[in-house]
Amino acid sequence: MRKNTYAMRYVAGQPAERILPPGSFASIGQALPAGEPLSSEERIRILVWNIFKQQRAEWLSVLKNYGKDAHLVLLQEAQTTPELVQFATANYLAADQVPAFVLPQHPSGVMTLSAAHPVYCCPLREREPILRLAKSALVTVYPLPDTRLLMVVNVHAVNFSLGVDVYSKQLLPIGDQIAHHSGPVIMAGDFNTWSRPRMNALYRFAREMSLRQVRFTDDQRRRAFGRPLDFVFYRGLNVNEASVLVTRASDHNPLLVEFSPGKPEQ
């Protein structure tokens, strides 16, 4: 699916830019350009949300109230309507979307809004074998104030597949990117973990990548068959706060996490 895999970058006052996959992170990681840090503070706030193609009312007010103070907003099922693009470009320096499939008017897929321009951007797609619909993922990298580089992986995992072969296949190129990155990592999104084999595959992947799971005390995450679908994983950072916002603005509840880029937990 590589020929159909690209990201669209939206920046205020500029035409949308198409970005193709750059190739192996291993060959590029040592030569990334310098950039402005994602945050000048000692914390990084993120919002993670499957926005349900903005089909319900109040989605924009949720983003305005909870997203505008975040350094990163990781959306899944984000449809590039004029309202969403306007919000993104008015409040963030960059918005990168990977079109998973093109709807009649506006493409839908994962979209990462960021308070700094990424110094690396790698779009990924995987097709669901049953419905033939694609799901997308996006890997971006941002400088931190301490000169480290933060890798951010925004994931919407394949949903309809028999067994976990295709599910695990989607994680492989993500793992290749993470494995060649020595700095901190945030991997988050809708992982469609509605079965035990899927949960096991995701947890196994997280262990292999040395990623820890963010825990939510009042866990109001969307569930299917009793299992949560949305996750935030991380390494090389500390978790200061983590909460779930209960809303009717989507069929998923947004996850709010604050990290500090200081010395990570042992």
Swiss-Prot record:
Where can this protein be found?
Answer: Cytoplasm
Would the keyword Cytoplasm be found if you checked this record's keyword annotation? yes
Molecular function (GO) terms for this protein are:
catalytic activity
What's a Pfam family this protein contains? Exo_endo_phos
Highest taxon of source: Bacteria
GO cellular component term of the entry, any = cytoplasm
Q: Which SUPFAM superfamilies match?
A: DNase I-like
Tell me which UniProt keywords the record has, alphabetically.
Cytoplasm
Family affiliation: Belongs to the UPF0294 family.
Please state what the protein is called.
UPF0294 protein YafD
Q: Which organism is it from?
A: Salmonella paratyphi C (strain RKS4594)
Instruction: Please spell out the taxonomic lineage of the organism that makes this protein.
Output: Bacteria, Pseudomonadati, Pseudomonadota, Gammaproteobacteria, Enterobacterales
